[in-house]
């Protein structure tokens, strides 16, 4: 199991591409989004708050499609102007929130991904018991499981998995 950390995420303007994809199609979908950003780069926002991320609203499998959304934060003051240059992307504002997260190193393996998801699931169960009778204001169903991609070197990318929430 992994240690679950907590962090505050600010309100962000996001340019997004959202689609139902099957298990095999999720990689092609991610490559499509990355190709758009490489072809027409967006202004950089430093740190995790500015990193591209993927939201799994539901998980694709061999048996069914899942709803996935790729997002790139953009400067709020430039968001509407930038959106005009990306007609295939949708502009939306994400509210400020807290996230429970697990960080994985560059070169992570599938087993580490599974352990990280298990750690987040265990955290959610503990929070639900601690706050019995209350509703976590933002749940995975509200904002999905997020995967944030962070460059750690010229060819290395570390990721973290996060669940948004607020008590």
Question: Where are the language model's segments positioned?
Answer:
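A solvent-exposed interaction/effector surface
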Residues: 1-167
